[in-house]
């Protein structure tokens, strides 16, 4: 593989010295970019875009042509894993993801296969390999998966949910069934992420979008336990260097210590978490990623720069910070404002690395 020209992101994940704070944005390849919308229209729909390695590569690279980002992230979707288990993923306009088949009982869970990532998810590996070749070592490539708990919520609910009543009904009435599902998903995610690493991903991230809807006790039992299982099962070295892993639980700021105990390299923070407090609590053990409110990108440029300075000052001097949004960028944000954010991170962070 080509030697990496900019390894700032990987170094920061391992709390090694960098010249400026690295930055990337969750959903940086997305609907806020007109060129993304044109490529998606060319593909026909979102799923077709994910399954076409050349077009998935194109949209992965689009934000890097506009902004001096320090990492690329694979263009895909967290729901590729349940789709590969036979649930039939599709998207309703204005409704988000849906499954043709939901998981409703113990027998459904027992029937679920553990997908072979080189077969049922081979299109993802093709995309990873295509992106790595096209990056030519400019920046590292991040692979990712959803967490078992988050994937299970979509599988049991049949799609997006506001109240999570169906999965919580299973959790409280038949916890053994839910544990069986979560264990199958953890095994599937280990295989999936390790295949991404073999295909060329240089870091991986686990998105636990819905862990924050649980109580602390239930979070440890039904979400964190299975992310820990994944971290333990991951290939942590490739191409002669460590492959860092980041955990991100939206709404998980109260559980940072327990998350750091998994042995991950970094924690993603949402915007409700104070980064100075997070560093005091776990900064000696893990790097921190985040954590500007994505809605701040609607603000005038001066306000965006002010917020970047506040976050950088909150983390303070030294290593182990990757600047990012606290969740995905909104589709109607002006691309110019995303550029202001990225440029401000690099320019304003210089004094923190002397």
UniProtKB/Swiss-Prot annotation:
Predominant location category: cytoplasm
A GO cellular component annotation in the UniProt record: cytosol
Molecular function per GO: uroporphyrinogen decarboxylase activity
Organism (species): Edwardsiella ictaluri (strain 93-146)
Family label: Belongs to the uroporphyrinogen decarboxylase family.
Keyword DNA damage belongs to the record: no
Subunit structure: Homodimer.
Location of the protein in the cell: Cytoplasm
Residues with site note (Transition state stabilizer): 77
Gene3D superfamilies: 3.20.20.210
Binding site for substrate: 27-31, 77, 154, 209, 327
Protein name (Swiss-Prot/TrEMBL): Uroporphyrinogen decarboxylase
The protein's Enzyme Commission number: 4.1.1.37
PANTHER family in alphabetical order: METHYLTETRAHYDROFOLATE:HOMOCYSTEINE METHYLTRANSFERASE RELATED (PTHR21091), UROPORPHYRINOGEN DECARBOXYLASE (PTHR21091:SF169)
Cleaved signal peptide residues: none
InterPro entries: UROD/MetE-like_sf, Uroporphyrinogen_deCO2ase_HemE, Uroporphyrinogen_deCOase
